[in-house]
A protein has these predicted regions:
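Alpha-helical adaptor scaffolds
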Residues: 290-326, 333
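Amphipathic alpha-helical scaffolding segments comprising HEAT/armadillo-like alpha-solenoid repeats
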Residues: 310-314, 345-359, 378
């Protein structure tokens, strides 16, 4: 096989299924993969021990006999304001927080996996020879961004994310590892897309927790996304105030990136902010968010007051489940502590009562965060 026409067929089929971009790369050891060991040795991965899986250094370790990797991009950009443009000044009525744009809608793992499975089925129908295919969406021992770069889909930016000249960085990556011998999207004489970051350092300078050790190198232990999602313990106190009102993930280094200023919008309804995820909001007598968009600028009191049962129900099928109930409540307490509420106001009295209740929680990370927040608003 190994005809470029086959690769063109795969790319066109992927686009017909709904992917915005698709590229193919030959399986191999790429120089960027070797840099991971040094990054891990510096301790930058924090509690993410799964990143030390030795299979991540070579896709041959993941699928024996692998010949090619199909990399697909799916845009999740919505028409809503960026975190750097959104106002959070209405604190004296109802403090609000920020959830990362990618988590507003349906769990992207499910959305991409469905499409990757359809693409794999198309491959089986099209190619007569027997082959193996295995798909991953941000869950396996695969470094998707490196593979995407060498498939010609973009370059690795100073914020460590994959950047595409047209799409910016608001997209998800999914891959299919296969024993099919497909021609690569880039010929042997072609290099991956050039680094177009130039002298820009807006992402580096905008990070409120100074998570970037240097361009292209992040200390995940200081990244707001890591702190709000992956970290299971209490958030280091010196990082709580810089985190501001973030309760799940962070978009700042993407929101300030010039390549995202003209990025096209996603058409998929799955990635729009969830609307009224459960009847519990009605039962509690509260309205979740402006315009009934429950996860865009969510009310912090609502998030902090969620029971574990309500959390499981409301965030079923959402990537927010990864932080777990105690993590989300911890984050909401931290954000309330950064809300600059005026003493004696109705909202300050109400929030103080909520935090006092949470300060007595049997969950240490919740109780500790609530006590810190109380000390900030009283």
């Amino acid at each position: 096989m190994n005809h470029f026409s086959d690769t063109q067929w795969v790319v066109e089929r992927a686009k017909s299924i709904g992917f915005d971009r698709c590229g193919v790369v030959r399986a191999g050891r790429f120089p960027e993969l070797a840099q991971t060991s040094e990054w891990l040795a510096r301790g930058y991965a924090g509690e993410m021990e799964y990143l030390a899986d030795p299979r991540r250094s070579d896709v041959q370790n993941v699928l024996p006999g692998i010949a090619s990797v199909i990399v697909c991009l799916l845009n999740y950009n919505t028409a809503h304001p960026l975190s750097t443009e959104s106002t959070l000044q209405n604190d004296q009525v109802e403090p609000r927080g920020w959830i990362s744009r990618y988590a507003w809608g349906r769990d992207y793992h499910d959305v991409l996996r469905e499409r990757l499975d359809r693409l794999a089925d198309c491959l089986r129908e099209h190619f007569s020879e027997p082959f193996k295919a295995r798909s991953y969406v941000d869950t396996g021992p695969v470094q998707e961004r490196v593979l995407a770069k060498h498939a010609g889909l973009g370059w690795l930016g100073k914020n460590t994310l994959l950047l595409n000249e047209t799409l910016g960085s608001f997209f998800f990556l999914g891959v299919i590892l296969t024993t099919l011998d497909l021609a690569p999207s880039l010929s042997a004489k072609e290099l991956p897309p050039p680094d177009l970051c130039g002298n820009c350092r807006q992402c580096l300078d905008a990070c409120p927790t100074q998570a970037f050790v240097e361009p292209y190198v992040m200390d995940a232990r200081k990244c707001i996304s890591y702190l709000t999602i992956e970290l299971r313990q209490s958030i280091p106190e010196e990082l709580r105030e810089p985190m501001g009102r973030h309760v799940f993930g962070c978009d700042i280094c993407q929101d300030v990136c010039p390549w995202n200023r003209r990025a096209p919008l996603a058409a998929l309804q799955e990635f729009q902010p969830r609307v009224r995820p459960s009847q519990n909001e009605e039962k509690a007598g509260i309205s979740l968010c402006p315009g009934d968009e429950s996860l865009f600028l969510p009310k912090l009191e609502w998030l902090a007051g969620l029971s574990e049962t309500d959390f499981r129900e409301m965030f079923s099928g959402s990537p927010i489940r990864r932080t777990k109930w105690r993590g989300l409540v911890r984050n909401a307490c931290n954000a309330l502590g950064n809300s600059a509420l005026r003493p004696g106001t109705r909202v300050q009295v109400r929030v103080s009562a909520l935090l006092e209740r949470l300060a007595a929680s049997a969950e240490p990370v919740i109780a500790e965060s609530a006590r810190w927040a109380l000390s900030r608003i009283q």
